[in-house]
């Protein structure tokens, strides 16, 4: 069960609606990148906003495949996306992208032990609401530009997204467990991020499994 845990005045919660061609959404070779591009741009927005105010990150901000934002091995936030039809617009659909971040939540008020807050992994930050607005501006500007490029040439931008995501993917190289919707699981090491945004997991027998849709958790050492 996945739920949002929000602390008023200490969290960043936003939903953004974007319009995307139906052809891209239906193209399984590129559509997996839409949510990940949103995550990549949110990471860039966080890092950029912290630097804008003279802050310092003590931990790298990374992305856990496919939709979580991590810092110091703990969850800082998450990104979700949902497709919604646009009435009387057959060639485009809306995608609602939701983001939740812990900005100034104290350690003792975090919802779970495996979560963290930006104030716990960075120093010299401004007021949480000032930082929130700066992150929002950077994210919207960056995402607007990336999605425009993606619509212009989705296959070119999929390559670009993979190149950007691979070095900041926290999941890669780690032992993980994938939970599928049918109740089955798969354990192994995440070894590659593929052209279509799927994840390759190598099991204990050396068999490679391509995972497109699953809840993938990193196993404790």
What annotation goes with each model-predicted range?
Residues 137-221:
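Glycine-rich, charge-dense phosphate/pyrophosphate-binding loop(s)
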């Amino acid at each position: 069960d996945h739920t949002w845990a929000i602390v008023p005045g200490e969290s960043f919660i936003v939903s953004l609606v974007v319009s995307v061609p139906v052809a891209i959404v239906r193209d399984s070779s590129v559509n997996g990148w839409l949510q990940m591009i949103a995550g990549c741009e949110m990471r860039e927005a966080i890092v950029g906003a912290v630097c804008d105010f003279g802050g310092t990150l003590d931990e790298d901000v990374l992305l856990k495949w496919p939709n979580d934002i991590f810092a110091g091995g703990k969850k800082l936030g998450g990104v979700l996306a949902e497709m919604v039809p646009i009435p009387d617009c057959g060639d485009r659909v809306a995608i609602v992208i939701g983001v939740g971040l812990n900005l100034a939540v104290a350690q003792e008020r975090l919802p779970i032990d495996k979560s963290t807050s930006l104030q716990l992994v960075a120093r010299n930050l401004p007021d949480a609401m000032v930082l929130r607005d700066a992150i929002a501006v950077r994210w919207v500007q960056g995402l607007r530009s990336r999605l425009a490029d993606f619509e212009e040439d989705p296959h070119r931008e999929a390559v670009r997204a993979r190149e950007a995501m691979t070095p900041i993917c926290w999941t890669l190289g780690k032992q993980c467990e994938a939970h599928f919707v049918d109740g089955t699981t798969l354990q192994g090491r995440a070894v590659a991020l593929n052209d279509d945004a799927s994840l390759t997991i190598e099991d204990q027998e050396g068999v490679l499994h391509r995972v497109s849709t699953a809840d993938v958790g990193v196993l404790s050492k």
